[in-house]
Amino acid sequence: MGSLLSPEANAEVPREALSFHGNATGAQVHLDDQRSTARRRSTFHDGIVFSQRPVWPGERVALRVLRHEEGWCGGLRVGFTRLDPAQVAASCLPPFVCPDLEEQSPTWAALLPEGFVRAGNVVCFWVNRRGWLFAKVNAGRPLLLRKDVLVQGAPLWAVMDVYGTTKAIELLDPKANAWIRSGEPVPESEVISGEECVICFHNTANTRLMPCGHSHFCGSCAWHIFKDTARCPICRWQIEEVAVVSSLKAEEGS
């Protein structure tokens, strides 16, 4: 499945620019010639794509949402997998990364809040050495998506699901500044997304869903979620308790 990666040495190793793997794609995925853009042709599923090479702990995967399509529920999923796409037949890929691919392989992915995957938004995601999966949108603060990625013992490839309202995405160079729109103010809800509720974008996020620990919701929205589905909208874990907290901080790490 490829050589093991040493997190301690990753800073010194030159990295090939990320692109999408050319063969292991969902049944509805169309890639451009450079394998930097992935578009879902139709339906709302079968949009799984992988990076063409393993990704280091702490390495950022940056992408832009090119097209948003109304009429579906839910959007882009991002995460990491130990599944080597070079060993995967496209015809064997399931329709969804969550939960299908997660159940079939060592894969850890999460749904991004719909408000963060509008057309033009830049999404950056990564996993740190503790196995914590983070995502950041535009100039916003990091969101902790989950804390259970296994980073030791085998390489990890980035995996994305061009699902639902997300119709097309483009991989970007996270070290380049060309996609940072200088001079344009970032909407307040994005800058302080770690402090405002990611559902209503109005009230302060002051609750923590247990046991997953996600803390991006105000009390009113959290209790509506608990009553309606009892599942975290970010990681889909079962909610057993809604805890009210006075101060919320997530350790980003690298």
Swiss-Prot record:
<dbReference type="Pfam" id="PF07177">
    <property type="entry name" value="Neuralized"/>
</dbReference>
<dbReference type="GO" id="GO:1901800">
    <property type="term" value="P:positive regulation of proteasomal protein catabolic process"/>
</dbReference>
<keyword id="KW-0808">Transferase</keyword>
<dbReference type="InterPro" id="IPR037962">
    <property type="entry name" value="Neuralized"/>
</dbReference>
<feature type="domain" description="NHR">
    <location>
        <begin position="17"/>
        <end position="174"/>
    </location>
</feature>
<dbReference type="InterPro" id="IPR043136">
    <property type="entry name" value="B30.2/SPRY_sf"/>
</dbReference>
<dbReference type="GO" id="GO:0061630">
    <property type="term" value="F:ubiquitin protein ligase activity"/>
</dbReference>
<keyword id="KW-0399">Innate immunity</keyword>
<dbReference type="InterPro" id="IPR001841">
    <property type="entry name" value="Znf_RING"/>
</dbReference>
<dbReference type="GO" id="GO:0016567">
    <property type="term" value="P:protein ubiquitination"/>
</dbReference>
<keyword id="KW-0863">Zinc-finger</keyword>
<dbReference type="GO" id="GO:0008270">
    <property type="term" value="F:zinc ion binding"/>
</dbReference>
<keyword id="KW-0479">Metal-binding</keyword>
<keyword id="KW-0963">Cytoplasm</keyword>
<dbReference type="InterPro" id="IPR006573">
    <property type="entry name" value="NHR_dom"/>
</dbReference>
<comment type="pathway">
    <text>Protein modification; protein ubiquitination.</text>
</comment>
<keyword id="KW-0833">Ubl conjugation pathway</keyword>
<dbReference type="GO" id="GO:0045087">
    <property type="term" value="P:innate immune response"/>
</dbReference>
<comment type="function">
    <text>E3 ubiquitin-protein ligase that plays a role in various biological processes such as lung development or innate immunity. Seems to utilize UBE2E1. Promotes innate antiviral response by catalyzing 'Lys-63'-linked ubiquitination of IRF7. Plays an essential role in TLR4-mediated activation of MAPK pathways by promoting 'Lys-48'-linked polyubiquitination of the phosphatase DUSP1/MKP1.</text>
</comment>
<dbReference type="GO" id="GO:0005737">
    <property type="term" value="C:cytoplasm"/>
</dbReference>
<dbReference type="InterPro" id="IPR013083">
    <property type="entry name" value="Znf_RING/FYVE/PHD"/>
</dbReference>
<feature type="zinc finger region" description="RING-type">
    <location>
        <begin position="197"/>
        <end position="236"/>
    </location>
</feature>
<keyword id="KW-0391">Immunity</keyword>
<dbReference type="Pfam" id="PF13920">
    <property type="entry name" value="zf-C3HC4_3"/>
</dbReference>
<keyword id="KW-0862">Zinc</keyword>
<protein>
    <recommendedName>
        <fullName>E3 ubiquitin-protein ligase NEURL3</fullName>
        <ecNumber>2.3.2.27</ecNumber>
    </recommendedName>
</protein>
